[in-house]
Amino acid sequence: MKTRIIISLIVVVCVALLSTVSGVNSAEYDYEVKAKKMSFGWKVVGDTLAVKMSAKTEGWVGIGFNPSKKMKDANFVLGYVKKGEAKIIDEFGNEPTKHTSDKKLGGTVDATLVGGTEEGGITTIEFTMPLKSADKYDPAIDVNGETIVLLAYGPSRDSFKTKHKYRTALKVNLSTGASEAVKK
């Protein structure tokens, strides 16, 4: 009798653990917006933003938050997958049409790579970042207000030096999922 109870408990615990692990691995996001051949999914977890970005490219995918003019003052994260290994960079829009590594400007890298894949001509990058870091090159993001989000992807080349093949700007409320295209 005790053996059956112990086996039943082990089965229940294993099922619960498998359910939890599969939920974590699927990395469900609360919201997602799509723009042409690109998507941006996100979830706010405390003071952290979890992001998933995908595009129909075998090159880089990127996102920027809250520019003041074109790309200026935006916090950018770009990523690609090469030979199965994902890589990201954290940059700051230091000019209307240019962004530079936070580290090179004297800041810190505050985006943390979660993972990335390149399958069927689609590159997907997942990362987390603080909503408010101590880095002056990472402007705070207010999840309750409107956030301007820049989405872009590059040509089929694993290099952060190539110019975007596609780009767009969206106005997003990160706490409700409401979004609309920004008129240019």
Q: What does each model-found stretch correspond to?
A:
Residues 1-10:
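Bacterial N-terminal signal peptides that target proteins for export
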Residues 9-19:
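Bacterial N-terminal signal peptides
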Residues 22-184:
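Extracellular-facing/secreted segment signature in eukaryotic proteins
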